Amino acid sequence: VYSGDASYIISENPNMDYFTPSQGTNNWYDAMVITRDCSETELAHQFINFMLNEESALSNTEEVGYTSPVKSVYETMITGEYEGVSSYIPDFENPNSEIFRYQEPKIKQKYAELWTKIKAE
């Protein structure tokens, strides 16, 4: 499951836990971007600013369980509802973990083939 789902599951069931193998995993990052061909850049900036507003960021974090980039929200959550929940607190200290990169053309092609197959089913 995704870490946000795991955070929710763990908060509802103390018998569940989140495990990161010592062999490593991928370091995950969520991001908002504005594409170069975006026709509504001002609106996109307004949306990003809205999502980074402390109240909105807290509400979003409480709803989806994902770690917030807003420091005050993160600190509120790790000392509150998600205190001690390992799926909420990212572990970037494991030297065996890595950032997955999918830039190779053969990988992009494979994703395109799989996506086409999924859409066809």
Write out the residue ranges for each language-model feature.
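Mature extracytoplasmic/periplasmic domains
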Residues: N26, T35-P95
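A generic helix-loop boundary/linker signal
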Residues: P21-G24, D37, R101-P105
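Short amphipathic alpha-helical segments
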Residues: D30-M32
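Ligand-binding pocket segment of bilobal, Venus flytrap-like solute-binding proteins
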Residues: V1-P21
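Conserved C-terminal helix/tail region of periplasmic/extracytoplasmic solute-binding proteins
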Residues: F92-E121
